[in-house]
């Protein structure tokens, strides 16, 4: 008896497992899993824009976004206005539901760019424990940036 999608992997669960691996320090293994999923949907054997599980455009594959959050170490509290990001040098995407942008981390500097919306910050924390508490909350407006030195 042919079963629709009977031989398809559940990509959403693969992304979830990969994200867990990132949080456990297994970044290379996680990258291997994500690469395997993306290779499966290469446009030759499967549609690269439709990771089918239980029908077309099934939402569970959206779990892939959780890997971005895990790799960047991003967390934002709208209550305390704390912006947390990885201490690893690089350029990282962030999004908090009301605004989005990127943060560039280099040694002891963090530059936060807001591409859409506005972002209120009181504390900037790196995931290595270093943080900068501002004397007063500041708001970074859309299409603006602020650079912070964290010692």
Positions of the model-derived regions?
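Surface-exposed interaction regions enriched in Ser/Thr/Asp/Glu
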Residues: 146-151
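Non-catalytic C-terminal accessory modules of carbohydrate-active enzymes
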Residues: 3, 7, 14-144
């Amino acid at each position: 008896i042919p079963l629709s999608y009977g031989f398809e992997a559940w990509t959403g669960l693969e992304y979830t497992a990969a994200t867990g691996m990132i949080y456990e320090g297994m970044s290379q293994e996680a990258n291997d899993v994500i690469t395997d999923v993306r290779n499966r949907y290469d446009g030759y054997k499967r549609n690269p824009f439709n990771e089918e599980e239980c029908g077309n455009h099934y939402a569970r594959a959206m779990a892939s976004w959780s890997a971005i959050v895990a790799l960047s170490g991003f967390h934002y509290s709208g209550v305390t206005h704390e912006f947390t990001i990885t201490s690893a040098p690089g350029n990282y995407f962030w999004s908090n539901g009301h605004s989005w942008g990127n943060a560039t981390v280099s040694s002891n500097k963090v530059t936060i760019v807001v591409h859409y919306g506005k972002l209120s910050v009181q504390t900037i924390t790196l995931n290595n424990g270093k943080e900068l508490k501002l004397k007063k909350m500041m708001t970074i407006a859309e299409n603006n940036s602020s650079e912070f030195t964290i010692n």
